[in-house]
Amino acid sequence: TLLPGSDPFIKPWMIDISDDHYALDISRARALLGWNPRHSLRETLPKMLTALQSDPVEWYRENELHAQTVSDGPAWPHVINMLLGLWLIGTVQALGTIEPSLLWSDLASGAAIILFSMLALRHTWAAWTVCGVGFWLMSAPLLFWASNAAVYNNDLLVGALVVTFAVIAPQLGRDDPGSGAPPGWSYNPSGWMQRLAIVFLAMIGFFLARYLAAFQLGHIVHPWDPFFGEGTRRVLTSDVSKAFPVSDAGLGALSYLLDALAGVIGDVRRWRTMPWMVVLFGLFIIPPGVTSIVLVILQPVGIGDWCTLCLVASVVMLLMVSPALDEVIATGQFLLRARRTGASVWRVFWQGERGAMDEPKIQSRSLLAEMLHSIEAFSAPWNLWLSTMVGVWLMAAPTLLNLVGTTADSTHIVGALVVTVSVVAFAEPARPVRLLNILCGAWLLLAAWIFHGGTPGWPWISIVTGLALIALNIRCGPIEDQYGDWQRVIR
C-alpha cells in the first residue's frame, strides 16, 4: 500500500464498489455562472501521493492527521520496554555473582533498550532495533557461559518480554475481518490456532532444553533421567556436546524460545504481509527439527548412551515441523505469483502485500476441531502411524535383539530416518515426503545381507520389516484440505 503501515479502514466490499463512479454535470454552472473547478482530482492526486511518499510524517503533520494511529501503533508497549531496560540496569548487580563481560553486556543492553524504545515512539525501525537487542540479551548468557542461574533466567525473561512488547504487542488486535486464507486454500495457514499449537509445543521444548542447559552451565549438579540413569550425564558431557562453542542444550532452549516468539509475530495474513517472517519462522523450526533427530541418531551410535529428555525434546521439535510447513508453502506460492505478475520478488519478500483481496470462504470449525486440525498428528493416516511405529521398532531393535557392530548402527539410523520422514509426512502438504521411506525399506532388504553383527534370524526380520515399510508408504492417504497450486504436488 502507499500509506505507511496497514490501513484498517479498507475492506473488500469497498474495493468492489470503487468502480461505481458518478460524473457530475457542471455544464449549467459553466453556462449560467461562468464557474469552472480550480482543481482536478486526476491531476492533484498524483501530487498528493508523491508528497506523502517523500515525507509521510511531515505530510500527516501538515494535514493535522495522526500518523501514529495509522502506522506506529500504541505507545504503551514501548514505555513498558523502557521500564524493562531500567529493571535490567538496576537488578543485574543484585542477582549475585556475574561474569564481568556479561555484566557490561547487560548494562549496555538495558541502556540501548531505553534509548531505542524512546525512538520507537516515532520511528518503526527503532522497534526492530529493540527486538535485536532482546535477541542479544537472550543469547549473551550462552556466549559468556553464565554461571549464575538467576542472571541467565533474568536475561532470558527480559529479552523475551522486550521482543514481545517491541514488535508483537503493537500489532495485536489489528486483524481485519475475513478468512485471511490464500487463494485456493480451504483454511488459513497463518491462523492463530494454527500458530498457537506450534507456540505451545515450542514452550514445552524450551523448558526441557532449559533444564538440560542448567546442568551444562553448572546450575545443577545432577541431571534427572527416569529411564537411562547416568545416560543423560554422559550425553551432555560427551565429545559431541563439547564440540559446540556454547552449551548445545542452551542453544536448543534459545531456538525453542525464538520459535515461540516468531509464532505470534504478525497478523492472520502474514503469509503475504510478512513473507520474510514466515520464511524465518520456517528456518527456526525445519532445519533444527532435522538437526535434533541427527543428534539423537548420534547418541547410541557415537556416544553409546540415551538421554530421555533429549528424546522428548526432539519429538517435540519434530511435531512442530508439520504445522509450520503449510505456512511456508503458502508464502512460497504468494512469492511465485508476485514473480509471474512482474513484481519485484525482493521488494515483496521484505515489504509484503497489505492491499485488500478476495479471500476464499473457509469452513467454520468448533474450537476443539480447530485445535485438532492445527496438530497434524491427529489427522495423519493410519499407514503413516504404522510407519512411525516401524521406525521406533527399528531404533529399539539393536537393544532388544542384541544386534552389534555395523548392523546395529545401520538399523538404528534407518529407524530414526523412518520416524522423521513419517512424522513430517503427517502434514498433508508434505505427504510426498513419505516416498523416502520406500528407499529406507529397500535399504533394509539389502543391509541384512551386507553388514555383520546380527542374529541368525535377523536377515529375515529385516526383509519383512523392509517390505512392510515399502507397502505402508505406497498409499498417500486422504487429502481433506485444499492447497491451491500445491494440490498437484501432493497427488
Regions found by a protein language model. Give the residues of each.
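N-terminal juxtamembrane segment and adjoining first transmembrane helix
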Residues: 61-72, 193, 371, 375
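Amphipathic terminal alpha-helices
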Residues: 28, 39-70
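Central hydrophobic cores of alpha-helical transmembrane segments
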Residues: 130-137, 437-444
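Conserved beta-strand/short-helix segments
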Residues: 71-75, 79, 120, 124, ...
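Conserved C-terminal active-site "lid" loop/helix of NAD(P)H-dependent oxidoreductases
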Residues: 2-34
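Membrane-interfacial helix-loop segments of redox and metal-homeostasis proteins
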Residues: 90, 96, 101-105, 145-146, ...
